[in-house]
Amino acid sequence: MQQKDTYHTIAESSEGIYTEKRSKFIAIAFPVHTVEEVKGYLEECQKKYYDARHVCYAYMLGPERTNFRANDNGEPSGTAGKPILGQIHSNELTDILIVVVRYFGGIKLGTSGLIVAYKAAAAEAIANATIIEKTIDEEVTVAFEYPFMNDIMRIVKEEEPAIVKQSYDMDCLMTLRIRKSCMPLLQKRLSKVETAHIITE
């Protein structure tokens, strides 16, 4: 079975709005890659919506989708962050932060009402987003002698990896990036070139 080497994320920020019993829920989805980026967007939202009752969020990072967090920001436990994260999960997204800002309308929604509202707002932001597929890429460095440059370049032309860096001193070095599922064949072909050897970090 071929290993999955793609994942889905959003191309740019998007918004969704859900209103229930005069409470307004504004959801903003951001494409993110690091926890630092998440913190930056959260600070931005807290400043922009300083007068909101709650600023709740959930995020998921990395192709393996193992780095995630949900925060209720003062709402009853499990009524905000978890339903937002649930939408990220059910849409199989990663490298995404969804912030849902709540303006209280004076009428309490109850636990189930809050869960529905946060879920619906997050779903709306995802529905308004452009979903894109990305590949999980890996890098390999190959060392070889200059006379065999043409053999290496023929493989590069046929397998179409991206050339990350290259240097031509006594030994030639070339670092290539290609999607994970194509890496074994690339390494196999490179290692068959005379004088070539794969450098492992």
What are these model-predicted stretches?
Residues 28, 56-57, 95-98, 139-141, ...:
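Structural motif
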Residues 162-168, 192-201:
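Conserved short beta-strand edge segments in small beta-sheet-based binding/regulatory domains
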Residues 176, 182-185:
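Terminal, non-globular segments
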Residues 142-160:
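Short amphipathic alpha-helix segments
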Residues 80-128:
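Active-site beta-strand/loop microenvironment that shapes enzyme catalytic pockets
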Residues 152-158, 184-194:
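Short amphipathic alpha-helices in soluble, non-transmembrane regions
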Residues 131-146, 174-176:
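Short glycine-/aliphatic-rich beta-strand segments at the starts of folded cytosolic domains
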Residues 1-78, 199-201:
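C-terminal regulatory domains involved in ligand/effector binding and gene-expression control
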